[in-house]
């Protein structure tokens, strides 16, 4: 099945430390690698479980991340009626994961 995944990661940044030639600490392909690994190697009955696991892995791999939002959208539905897609959005912070 084809899933669309949107990911938002929030963290504090000192504007004076930003450099146009350097990427912020978590803006690289490793984020994609984490999401791909979770999607390809784990099975969940509900999209909520997948979204939560993606958020957990991002938070555990990037200590700078304070808040992670994951949206998962599935366009291919096998249910009757005029439904275009199913979507779930989960937002977690470190407190939600029992880290503070």
Across the structure, where does each feature detected by a protein language model lie?
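N-terminal, polar/charged subdomain of small-to-medium soluble alpha/beta proteins
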Residues: 1-100
């Amino acid at each position: 099945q084809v899933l669309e995944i949107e990911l938002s990661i929030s963290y504090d940044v000192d504007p004076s430390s930003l450099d146009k030639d350097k990427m912020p600490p978590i803006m690289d392909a490793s984020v994609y690698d984490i999401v791909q690994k979770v999607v390809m190697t784990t099975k969940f009955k509900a999209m909520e479980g997948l979204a939560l696991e993606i958020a957990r892995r991002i938070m555990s791999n990037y200590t700078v991340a304070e808040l992670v939002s994951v949206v998962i959208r599935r366009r291919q539905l096998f249910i009757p009626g005029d439904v275009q897609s199913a979507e779930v959005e989960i937002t977690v912070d470190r407190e939600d994961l029992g880290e503070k």
